[in-house]
Every structure is written in structure tokens, then in C-alpha cells.
Amino acid sequence: MAKFISAKEAAKLIPDGSTVGVAGMGLAGWPEEVAVAIADNFKETGHPCNLTMKQGSAMGDWRERGMTRLGLEGLVTKWSAAHIGSAFAMNDLVRAEKMACHCLPQGVIVNLWREIAAKRPGLITKVGLGTFVDPRLEGGKMNKVTTEDLVELIEFNGEEYLFYKSFKLDVAMLRGTTADENGNITFENEGPINEGLAVAQAAKNSGGIVIVQVEYQALKNTLKPKDVKIPGALVDYVVVATDKNACWQTEGVYYEPAFAGNLRKPLSAIPILPLTERKVMARRAAMELSKGDLVNLGVGIPSDVASIVSEAGYIEEITMTTEIGGFGGIPASLPNFGSSYNAEANIDHGSMFDLYDGGGIDVAVLGLAQADEAGNINVSKFTIPGLGDRLTGPGGFINITQSTQKVVFAGSFNAKCEVEISDGKLIIKKEGRGKKLLKEVEQVTFSGKYAAENGQEILYVTERCVFKLINGKMTVIEIAPGIDLQKDILDQMDFTPAISADLKEMDSGLFSEKWDGLDTIMGK
């Protein structure tokens, strides 16, 4: 039977040098009160120290809550994650070479928990081949002090694969909504279900402990069995939070019932995007969808595609998914990314990546930080002139882009450029601080060569033009009205792209307040 303890008591249970696993995305699933207690105990006593943290997604609110709480020199000395951008204090230690850090694909980490639980040696997959995770490139190592090899290149039946090694998990640090007296955990106020069960099983079968923070305590035998997501037999300690600020559902909201499936929100209550270059790009990306498609949308501009489809009245014709397990409804943008308004179903994190890795979705729309002439994309480690280095990691980007037949990358042509939309045209008011279309990207998060070899359809949507990967080369296929090909596109790139013989103007309606561009596509 689980023991109910305080967060301070929980912090003292974590041994020095232990490996700690967490589950969730953003603040969803994050045990904030326990994390604060760990940091406080370290400040007071110097313990626990030399921890290795393992996480499958971004954990934090890009400010002070989340994994960044543990960003104290000596507290955590090794970090493996899919996304590290939202934990500023931890990120600073990585950039200062004071913490070793591996960034691995999100789907790899969340499914590696199951391999560990089953005491299998690791995960064999093609995900990551040709990217910075491939040991022939960087092996996922994000700085110079990271020397351990977590990924091996192997051959099986004459084909190349990557082997991601299992490890011993000492502590699972999780969150739910309610725990009964036996430690059974429900998630009724959470949005995504996440991978908490798999992490708990990995810890238990490694001989470790499972700590779960909840908001409420219930009498035993009062929870519905189908509502229990982590059985009490797997839980060692329960912390009932004393501060509601430790229980935020997402980075942006304490509790949104439509994210938890406890309310269906009218579509009229979901904000419509103003006409900006972001909306133009989201509209153009939406034109690559077809009726009946199963779709994944990435963070940033890609997540705005859901709003575009909803505004046009076709949200019932497309099934949107989120990496962490949402099916249907309208995926939310930051600061609520990962949750969905009015989802039809929520499955666990790892199962969603089984679908993605097997090519189960029709279209993916993801972000673009840097691109090069070979069609490679970098979103994981890059420099923005005037703003400095950005270490973010790939999130689910590698899994999704390598396994989906049609991928649309969407992002601004230059960093921090100023544009204006007037009379159905795009006007460049001021060029950006730095070029994003480079001779060679700083880090390969997506391999154009791998995509070309596998026959994927790849498009790159910016506010100025649209590129397509044709015969392994970036090719301009559309140009925005009001844009000069030479001055506004070619002169702003570090390489010369191919120009389609059938170069078209982007639909002028994309640059107008009213747009009916999805009507024909959806068969109205």
C-alpha cells in the first residue's frame, strides 16, 4: 500500500546519483511541489546530488516552473530529453558545459520506458537515421562534456537501424489528479494521459521507487477501475499537493475542462487568428490537407493550422492528433500545446508514437528554424543573430518527419523580419536579423536525403514563397503576391535553389481577411 507523505519527505527519499524519470508535457504531468522540495533540500543540505534526469518531452512553462526548478549546479549532472528548451536554468548549465546532455527523439524515450519495464536491452528503430542522433553525426550529444554513447548503429537483415540502450530507473516522479488510500491514481483533471504508467513500471521493475503527486485524496474502493491510470500496487509514495499552483494542467491554465474532456467547448469560444504572416503560412499549410486525413501539428505556426481548419468549418472533416495522445478536436497552441479542445479520445503517449512511427498519419505540419539546399531542417540547436544560441532538442520532430509520407514545414523566411499585408499582397518592411535558409544547417534534425530516398513528399511554406523537395533539391514552386523573386527571396538565401518551370503565385486569398481556400479541397 502506498504511503502518504509530504513533498519535503519525498525529496529526502531520492538517493544521490540516482536516475529519475518523469512523464508528461509542459506542466501536464509535472509534480511541481515535489520538484520545489528537491531543489530546496539541495540548497539546504547538498542532497540529492549528481542526479540523471530522463524525460520524454518539454517539461516546464518557459519561465520558472517545471524542470528548470532543478537547474542548480551539482543537483543534476546528466540530462536526457527530447526537448530541453523550456527549462532555462537547466539549459544554461548545458550551454556552460556544466551538465552532460543527450537529446533523443520523443517517441524513442517514451517507448524506451516499456523496454526497461520488460527488461529488454533497448529499442531498435530506424528513427534518427541520418539526423544528429545518428552516432555517425553527433549521437544526440548536445555539448562537449557529453561523452557517453547512448545510441549504436547496428545492421539487422541487411538494413541499418539505431539501437537505443535501456538503463536502470531508480525513481519515477509523476503526477495525477486523485489518489485513493491504496495509492490508485486517476487523471480526471489532466488533459493528456501521458506515459506515467510506463515510467512507473520501469521504476518498479528496476527495483526503484514511484512517487506520485496528486491534488486530491479519496477513500479506498471509491475510484472506478477504468479511471485508474496507475495502479496503487505500483505506487510507493503519494504527495497530496498543498498549493494549487503546483497542479497546473498546462503552462497556460490551472484547469480547462475542455482539455480534460469534462466539457465540450463551443467552437465560437475558440479565438480566431488575426490576419498576419503567421495566418498566411498556416492557411497555406492547411491547403495540403485532404478530407478524412489523420494529421499531426507541431508547435508554433503549425499549431495554428487547427484554428484555420476550425474557422473554415471543416474541423469535423480532419482528425488532428497530438504527440502526447490526443485524437480529434482542436489541438491547442502555446502555452497549452499538447492538450486539445474537445478531443474525441486520449491514448497514452507511447501508443501514439507507435502510430506515428508506423506511418499511420497522412500529413504532418511542423516548424522550420533553419533549412539548407539539401532540404535538411534544423529545429534542435541553432543560432539567431543578435539573440544567441538556442538549444531545444527535437521533441517528436524526428519520429514524425521520418515516418509520415507527406510533411509540410512552416516558418518565417528570415528570423525576426517585419512584414505587412495590404491589398492582398505581402510587403517586406524590414529584413530579419538572420537568414534561415543556409548553405548547411547547424544541426540535422530532418534529413532531406533520407526523405528523398524514401519517396516522401516534402514542402516548405514561408510567408514569401513555397519550396518543394524535388530530386533532392530545394525548389521554389510558389511566390507570394508583392514579392520580388530576386530581391526578396534569392538575395536573402545562402544558396541558390532550383526554380520550378511552372512557378506560380500563391493564392491571393491567403493574404485577405476572408478566405475560402479550403472549400474546394474539402469538397464543398
Swiss-Prot record:
The keyword Transferase applies. It catalyses: hydrocaffeoyl-CoA + (E)-caffeate = 3-(3,4-dihydroxyphenyl)propanoate + (E)-caffeoyl-CoA. Pfam families: CoA_trans. Homodimer. This is Caffeate CoA-transferase. The keyword tRNA processing does not apply. Induction: Induced by cinnamate and sinapate.
